[in-house]
């Protein structure tokens, strides 16, 4: 799962945050901290679907489902 988290961190930093040098910790809050806003949340959902082939339902686009890289990685692994 560590490799998946590293890949997610890099993709989010570059493609969502547009900050290639940004380091995101596995337990860092993405949504509840405001790092990822509602517009970026849709981009994140599309990134996960396109990159990992995992469908994210609209009802799952919230901090309860994937506020951290760890939560997001577990969701992806559970659906692959």
PLM region spans:
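Phosphopantetheine carrier-protein modules
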Residues: 16-35, 52-62, 80
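AMP-binding/adenylate-forming catalytic domain of the ANL superfamily
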Residues: 60-71
């Amino acid at each position: 799962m560590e490799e998946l988290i590293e890949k997610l961190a890099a993709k989010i930093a570059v493609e969502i945050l547009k900050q290639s040098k940004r380091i995101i910790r596995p337990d860092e809050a993405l949504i509840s901290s405001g790092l990822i806003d509602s517009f970026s949340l849709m981009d994140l959902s599309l990134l996960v679907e396109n990159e990992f082939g995992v469908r994210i339902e609209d009802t799952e686009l919230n901090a309860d489902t994937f506020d951290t890289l760890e939560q997001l990685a577990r969701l992806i692994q559970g659906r692959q």
